[in-house]
Regions:
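Short acidic/histidine-rich active-site segments
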Residues: 235, 258-275
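Extended substrate/RNA-proximal surfaces in nucleic-acid metabolism proteins
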Residues: 93-208
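Mid-to-C-terminal alpha-helical segments outside catalytic/metal-binding sites
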Residues: 279-310
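Structural preference for beta-strand elements that scaffold enzyme active sites
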Residues: 24-26, 56, 81-83, 109-112, ...
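Active-site glycine- and acidic-residue-rich loops that bind
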Residues: 89-95, 181-186, 210-216, 235-246
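An N-terminally biased module of ancient metal coordination in phosphate/nucleic-acid-related enzymes
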Residues: 2-79
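Histidine/acidic-residue-rich catalytic or RNA/ligand-binding cores of hydrolases
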Residues: 35-39, 67-69, 96, 191-196, ...
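Acidic (Asp/Glu)-rich catalytic clusters
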Residues: 18, 70-79, 101-107, 171, ...
Length: 310
């Protein structure tokens, strides 16, 4: 997910960067068909990944479960591996364990906690102001204006404990060995989720785009979450669109450790680079900052493959 912040100039991509991404998986791709206009569709994105030696990606929609789409793409583009996911916004019933259960039965690999309907993310988005909004915020305002937008969602109660609906969703995630991704919830919610996931038997937890403004986790917080068992995700769009400095993201990766980090693009927006190119630009940035080829492969190939296949 990205707002309409002015992006930087594209980074020239070397053969070395493409080589480092051979066999890579992007765990957060926003392509079409979708409620929001996208730069590319599922099929063409899978073909572009294969053409560059990358393996596949996870389809993220803020609104709809993507398990069925993923199965069709994987069959239609031989050699690709595309996976589905679900995001627990109001369009799927919010923190709805039935939706999680059926996503698991459909082969979905990631369950994102609320994003566009997260109380942490929607604060100030739906009540006017701010001419520059994320694409999704415009849709949320339209739904609110039509009187069909329920209250924002939180995974914790006033005492900071996971709510019963959140716990029930985590139980379904554990049952199907899916990846719990923290979405756009706030700092206290992220820590509650990571701790609760361990208690409820969830084996794979991904802290979503750690530097994104609505999360804005410090290096110390990211390391603490990794110490609790989470993998920390860093997304290309966050830094490319100037929501966080590259140097901060690189420092956070070094502090947490490459072995507990994944890189994703969060791409697919019409105004941003193509998904495959953005992934390679991210790899190039890391290489230019002194990370090794092996480091990039760990974050783009080894850990994503393990998360998807275990």
């Amino acid at each position: 997910m990205t707002t309409e912040t002015r992006p930087e100039e594209p980074t020239p991509i070397s053969d070395r960067a493409w080589k480092a991404l051979e066999g890579a998986y992007d765990l957060q791709v926003h392509v079409g068909p979708d409620v929001i206009a996208r730069r590319i569709d599922d099929l063409d994105c899978a073909k572009e990944f294969l053409a560059h030696g990358m393996k596949g990606f996870v389809l993220k929609s803020h609104y709809l479960q993507t398990g069925e789409r993923a199965q069709v793409v994987t069959k239609a583009v031989p050699g690709s591996r595309v996976f589905g996911a679900i995001t627990l916004n109001h369009s799927v019933g919010g923190l709805n364990p039935v939706a999680v259960e059926l996503a698991g039965r459909t082969g979905c690999k990631i369950v994102w906690c609320p994003t566009v309907d997260a109380a942490n993310e929607t604060a100030g988005r739906l009540d006017g102001g701010s001419a520059k909004l994320p694409f999704w915020a415009k849709i949320q305002r339209e739904l609110a204006a039509e009187g069909i937008s329920p209250p924002p969602l939180s995974v914790i109660d006033e005492a900071g404990r996971l709510t019963d609906p959140a716990r029930h969703c985590l139980e379904r995630i554990a049952k199907h060995n899916m990846i719990l991704a923290t979405g756009h919830v706030g700092r206290a919610e992220i820590f509650a989720l990571v701790r609760g996931a361990k208690e409820l038997g969830v084996k794979k937890v991904l802290v979503t785009h750690a530097e994104f403004p609505s999360q804005s986790l410090t290096g110390d917080e990211q390391k603490e979450l990794a110490d609790l068992g989470a993998i920390i995700e860093h997304c290309f769009t966050t830094t490319y669109t100037n929501k966080a400095p590259w140097e901060v993201a690189f420092a956070n990766i070094r502090q947490t450790g490459v072995s507990r980090t994944v890189i994703s693009t969060d791409l697919g927006q019409t105004i941003n680079p193509p998904v495959a190119d953005g992934f390679a630009m991210f790899a190039q940035r890391l290489l230019d900052a002194g990370f090794s080829d092996a480091d990039v492969r760990t974050m783009a190939v080894t850990i994503p493959t393990r998360l998807l296949d275990e």
